[in-house]
Amino acid sequence: MKKSILFIFLSVLSFSPFAQDAKPVESSKEKITLESKKCNIAKKSNKSGPESMNSSNYCCELCCNPACTGCY
């Protein structure tokens, strides 16, 4: 019985503000900047197969992922 009460007490205590780090969010050292890019979607080529699947335009047409080359 004592062990269960202690377990419940520690569980509740872990969610209290005393158990959590109280640093403000602005104090983080990492700064993230977002860049918006336009997708130049080229006309679909008549190619089919792995050659067209690996092209940068295919990646751009799917999701405009900024990590893809040719997706600007």
From Swiss-Prot:
Keywords: Disulfide bond, Enterotoxin, Pharmaceutical, Secreted, Signal, Toxin, Virulence. The keyword Disulfide bond applies. Disulfide bonds join 59-64, 60-68, 63-71. It comes from the Bacteria. It is found in: Secreted. Coiled coil: none annotated. Residues 20-53 form a propeptide. One of its GO terms (cellular component) is extracellular space. GO terms for molecular function: toxin activity. It holds the Pfam family Enterotoxin_ST. The keyword Nucleotidyltransferase does not apply. Residues 1-19 form the signal peptide. Belongs to the heat-stable enterotoxin family. Toxin which activates the particulate form of guanylate cyclase and increases cyclic GMP levels within the host intestinal epithelial cells. This is Heat-stable enterotoxin A3/A4.
